[in-house]
Structure formats: C-alpha cells, structure tokens
C-alpha cells in the first residue's frame, strides 16, 4: 500500500468557506480515483468541520476545484440560485430528454468523489448535514406513480449501490439503506414545507462489521434544533459488493425507474445548500 497522501486544508468557522490546497484537476467519472492510499478523513486535527459547501461565491463547484458537478448536458441541469444573503445550487431533471440523462439514468447530481474531505473509509465516524428545498414540487395524489426521487446519497465507489440515501416518497421523505433493506420515514408530510428549507443530519459510524450505526435527524421550518427521527444500531454500514476502498457524497436529483409512460411528473427541481461533513471521532 502506498504511503498516505497528505492534503492541506484551511478550515474556518462552520458557516464559512473551506479552502483546499494541493488540489488536482477534477476527474470526469464519479467513481474515479482510489482512497486505498489515503488516511481516514477522521484523522484530521484541523477542525471538527471537514468540509463546508455553501455556494457563497455563486459557483457550481462552490470554489472547490475537485468538486464534481453534474454530468447531465442540459444547460439548466444544474445552476446557482440566490438564497438569503448568498446562493444555493439547483438540480433539474426532465424525463424523456437526453439532456438530463447522466450515467445512463435520469439524474443531475454533484459529488465529492474527488474531494479528500468528502470521502469516507472504514473507521470514520462522520456527520453529514444538508439543507434541501423542493422547488415548485408537484405533490403525489392517490393512484399516481409511487416512484421516489433520490435527493442525497452516501455512495460506495466502484459502481456500487449507495450505503444510504434520502428520497421523496409520495408526499414524505424516507431514509433507506438498499443493501440492508432498511427504510424509515423521517418526514411524514413535506407538503406544508414546499418552497421552504428543510434541514437534515445523518450520523454514520463506518464499519465493515455489525458494529456501525446510522442516526437520522431533521430540523423543519420553524424548529430551532434537530430532532432524532431514526437510529439503526449494530449494522454493517460499509458494504460494497464490488471492490471499493472509499465512499463519497452525492446530492441533487436522481429519478430511478421513472418514465413519462408510467405517468411520473415530467420535470422536478430541487435546491441544496450548506452541505457539511463533520468529524465525530473526537466526540
């Protein structure tokens, strides 16, 4: 195994930007690179905040050169929008239009596959926070297609299924681990919060045995703090089928198994902001 590659970061306040030194050109593929030679993200002693992506500068990569932006080719598959005092990122997918197809499926997503601080390995204990707004969202009615829209993933590299993801399901938001066949509703009804920012937190202990955990919390509009919604303890959280040494985060809009022929909503748009990775190993 190669010696660990050292990365230099300047971490500022949790609400501030993150500057990454020793950067390299972002790779085209979202599973590119290997983290076998890299130290655990949790080994960082700079700050509890490993990564803070807030789009304050109005750029799709939030000023982080290695951040992967959408592979969909439509001009509006991803764009920056005003949000409060600064900005957020929008992802859009229109079914039946090849401009919104990425890696063979209807999706438009950003990812940390080439950002060291956005990767995870066995042994890491990390917190993932993000804010999401469902923009001009058509709600589900009884009898309509029940296919869900994936809005955030903790993804194993190597073309594997995600370890976990959050998805809209009918008019709710659910947490799911597909390989472990775990699923729970964490937002019972998002309809009162359409066009508003909803905040999510996922704590994960990354293990390749049955000692890990997922803890999912939400902070809805009008709430002052996070509420724990679901805990899965004593589970194997790092479980790629294909060989993979690391995982990474993805956010945006992925619409698996959806088609116009099935009556799925033609166009969806979702906003994301304040994507953060925090080290829990010292807590």
Pin down the residues of each PLM region.
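Secretory targeting and sorting signals
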Residues: 1-29
